[in-house]
Each structure stands twice: as structure tokens, then as C-alpha cells.
């Protein structure tokens, strides 16, 4: 059974807004290493759309946006290659190596956890809260 790990960047005062911190090289290196330890990522709609719009273009075209430093490329390539499951009742279509996780959330995630592998990672705020309420998160990283 593979574990479900929750990882989020949070400030000491409890802020989880990605715009409230400076994403430095060490943070991106750690994030790429963390993602490489997972077989798949679980995203809610908001996190999926945020990550897809920010990281997919560079990984696919090799052209970095003006805001992206060269040391961000390994993270972009790692997250681009990762398998993704998206929980959403409003999105009609996903790609980016992703598929929908539909039906009962608890049952669907339990099925994923029962598969062999290194583990699953979830980020964001709403989906992890629901998973925590179901008792499905095995490890927390802040």
C-alpha cells in the first residue's frame, strides 16, 4: 500500500498563499526531490489549474517565461512528467498527464493507495482538508 503525503509551503503565521513567500532555489530543489518520490500527484481544480498554467509551458516548449529562473527548470520538468489525478466537479477536460478522480472521494483515493508504488502526493488547501477529514493522509510535510 502506498502512502498519501501532504506537502504545503506555509509561513510561521499559518499563511499558505504561494504569493506570500519568495520561491528560492532551495525551495524548488526540495520540491522537485519531493515530487520525484511520488508515483502520482492529487490535485483539486484550483491547484491543478495554477500548476498547469505556470509549469507546463516551459516544460513543453523549453522556453522560459520572463519570471522563471533557470534553476526552476528541474521542478518544471519533474512536475510536467508526473502522473496527476484531478478532483473536480466543474472541469470538463484535463490533460497534462492527468485524469479525473471521480465518484466517492474516499473510495477513489483508497483504491489509489492500495496500488503498489512509492507514494502519492497532494498539495493545496481544500482537497487535503477533505482527505484529512476522511483520515486518508499518512504523512504531513510543512
Where are each of the predicted segments found?
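Portal/gating segments that form or line small-molecule/metal binding sites
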Residues: 1-142
Amino acid at each position: 500500500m502506498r502512502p498519501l503525503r501532504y506537502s504545503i509551503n506555509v509561513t510561521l503565521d499559518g499563511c499558505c498563499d504561494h504569493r506570500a513567500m519568495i520561491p528560492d532555489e532551495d525551495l524548488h530543489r526540495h520540491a522537485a526531490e519531493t515530487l520525484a518520490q511520488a508515483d502520482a500527484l492529487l490535485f483539486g481544480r484550483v491547484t491543478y489549474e495554477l500548476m498547469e498554467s505556470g509549469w507546463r509551458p516551459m516544460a513543453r516548449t523549453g522556453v522560459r517565461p520572463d519570471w522563471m529562473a533557470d534553476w526552476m527548470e528541474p521542478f518544471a520538468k519533474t512536475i510536467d512528467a508526473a502522473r496527476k489525478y484531478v478532483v473536480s466537479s466543474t472541469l470538463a477536460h484535463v490533460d497534462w498527464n492527468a485524469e479525473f478522480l471521480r465518484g466517492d472521494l474516499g473510495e477513489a483515493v483508497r483504491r489509489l493507495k492500495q496500488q503498489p508504488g512509492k507514494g502519492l502526493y497532494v498539495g493545496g488547501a481544500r482537497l487535503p482538508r477533505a482527505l484529512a477529514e476522511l483520515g486518508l493522509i499518512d504523512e504531513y510535510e510543512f
